[in-house]
């Protein structure tokens, strides 16, 4: 049985919600803790790097846990739901920091940010791993992957377009207050989106997944030159995206300067976000039909 339009839409809604959360953290956590709360830039940057290195080991470990999971609700949905709820709570805590100073704020940021990464991985790994378990044919798997990636792009674009507008509208002159309300709004959307996804998309089979230890995974990676090339290119692409999303707001604030920098930043983000949505919803599916995976990549 092929996936219904309703199921594909529900899976896409899940992608929108989870990438809204990811984009909010990836694009604004440095600005929030450095410019709004006043932590040293070197410290914030160091914690971001440490968190990414930690993720490199945490992600495969999470994959092993998911593969070994057996529940009456399936292998993936319990992780998606529990990870979503936990991550939503941590996201709010990340952008609703208590009034602390100096070392106390540094400790708070370090713990909460790394915890955010752990809880996000709890739902992100099983979300994408669920695709083979909810589809029966290669065509269905391909279509669902396209839906997921397209909608994920929409989610991140929405954050780029509306975050600073909402921060100003909800917080007035206080960016600290504005970010707290935006985080709460995004967290609620996130939970609702994943609930819709898990309620509509259910596993159709319980095929056994051959598990490997984290050490075996890294050994297999480093013994495969083609896999290393792919992983290396992904690292470079994600590094470029991460740097751009984190630093573009500083370009507008300190290079454009003046009282109107937020308007300029919002205009830029709106145009870029709209272009991203258009590309993901129109251009990407068309190119996917015209080109092979390798050529498209």
List each language-model region with its residue ranges.
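Membrane-embedded alpha-helical bundles of multi-pass transporters/translocases
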Residues: 1-297
